[in-house]
């Protein structure tokens, strides 16, 4: 099956008045499902990190193509394109002239990524890899991360580790936490609560 997904956005509009505002399409993509494999083309969401995407989270943050495969307890995805809103908020644009700050800005540069997650029964394991494909030293980045979730009855213990191998200095980030409950947006009244400690180096943070 093939689906087209789009979302319109606009400035503040009062439908009872005579004011006007610009309307735009902030997310638009086409997805085709081949069964265990599906392909997505266009502008789609991207999430990096647990806790809802602490490293990076945008429902329209990537322009490109993705191939994903579902093997039951193991899922993998690879993609190519460009971030359109990924910026490390610790830096100004002039900082990119300093090789020590490479990786600070990753938007609008060709990017390859690969993601995988596995349900191993006693725990869930996942890994992510993102790399810049333009070979520009001042904008180069090479980010990888691994994470673990261990369910214990209604509780869960989780943690992550990330590193930007091209950054000098504070190039990594990690967290550990505990959660309770299971939120399901299709079931009113369900909820979840997570508490975590995050240690984030400036070289790996993307403004999530």
Question: What are the residue ranges of the model-derived segments?
Answer:
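Oxyanion-binding "anion nests"
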Residues: 141-180
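Outer membrane beta-barrel
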Residues: 1-92, 110-126, 171-207
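Short, catalytically relevant binding-site loops at active-site mouths
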Residues: 132-134, 163-167, 201-202
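Intrinsic disorder/low-complexity signal
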Residues: 94-97, 159, 193
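Loop-centered beta-sheet repeat module
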Residues: 93-140
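Short secondary-structure boundary segments
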Residues: 20-26, 57, 126-151
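Active-site proximal loops enriched in glycine and acidic residues that flank catalytic Cys/His/Asp
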Residues: 129, 159-163, 197-199
């Amino acid at each position: 099956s093939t689906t087209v997904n789009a979302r319109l956005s606009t400035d503040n509009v009062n439908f009872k008045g005579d004011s006007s505002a610009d309307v735009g399409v902030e997310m638009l993509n086409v997805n085709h499902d081949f069964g265990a494999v599906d392909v997505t083309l266009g502008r789609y969401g991207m999430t990096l990190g647990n806790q809802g995407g602490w490293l990076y989270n945008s429902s329209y943050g990537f322009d490109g193509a993705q191939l994903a495969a579902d093997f039951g307890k193991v899922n993998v995805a690879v993609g190519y394109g460009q971030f359109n809103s990924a910026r490390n908020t610790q830096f100004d644009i002039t900082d990119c002239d300093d090789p020590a700050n490479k990786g600070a800005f990753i938007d609008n540069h060709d990017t390859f990524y690969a993601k995988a997650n596995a349900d191993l029964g006693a725990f869930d394991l996942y890994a992510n890899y993102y790399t810049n494909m333009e070979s520009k030293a001042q904008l180069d980045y090479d980010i990888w991360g691994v994470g673990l979730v261990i369910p214990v009855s209604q509780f869960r213990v989780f943690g992550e580790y990330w590193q930007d191998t091209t950054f000098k200095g504070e190039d990594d980030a990690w967290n550990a936490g505990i959660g309770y409950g299971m939120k399901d947006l299709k079931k009113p009244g369900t909820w979840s609560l997570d508490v975590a400690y995050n240690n984030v180096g400036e070289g790996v943070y993307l403004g999530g």
